[in-house]
Swiss-Prot record:
Highest taxon of the lineage: Bacteria
Keywords linked to the UniProt accession: Membrane, Transmembrane, Transmembrane helix
Comp. bias intervals (Basic and acidic residues): 30-58, 67-81, 89-113
Protein name (record): Uncharacterized protein YhcC
Natural source organism: Bacillus subtilis (strain 168)
Membrane topology: Single-pass membrane protein
Compartments in which it is found: Membrane
Membrane-spanning segments: 2-22
Gene Ontology cellular-component terms listed: membrane
Principal location listed in the UniProt entry: membrane
Statement: the UniProt record of this protein carries the keyword Lyase: no
Start and end residues of each stretch annotated as Disordered: 24-124
Length: 124
């Protein structure tokens, strides 16, 4: 019995919340009048006195050369990074060009087999 009453109460609360939310979301005649009375922003009024080109010119970034020690340090760090990156790229190309000879393959296989045999012997 208590469960049924709790369910009915929950349904009533949910219905009330939905109704309250819908009433606040839809503009009534009072809210429409208030929005009509609001004056347009100052920017729209001054559009004729202050054209868009002038506003755009204010926001364009200008290139300023600054020889501060911090900027010099940053550019030096960038140069070092670029040099290191080129070294890594060059070393990758060198390793890619190296061909694996048949003798080196045999040596690697032999050392691998020796390692496996020594592991098997340790287990015994």
């Amino acid at each position: 019995m208590a469960i049924i009453i709790a369910i009915i109460a929950a349904v009533i609360v949910i219905a009330a919340l939905i109704t309250f939310n819908v009433r606040n979301a839809s503009p009534g005649p009072e809210k429409q009048e208030a929005t009509d009375r609001i004056a347009p922003p100052e920017e729209e009024k001054n559009e004729a006195h202050y054209p868009a080109e002038a506003r755009a010119a204010e926001h364009t970034p200008s290139v300023v050369k600054n020889d501060s020690p911090k900027e010099k340090r940053d550019t030096m760090g960038d140069d070092i990074y670029r040099q290191a990156l080129q070294k890594f790229k060059h070393s990758d190309e060198v390793h890619a060009e190296e061909e694996v000879t048949e003798e080196s393959d045999k040596m690697q296989d032999r050392s691998y087999r020796d390692a496996l045999l020594s592991m098997k012997n340790k287990k015994k």
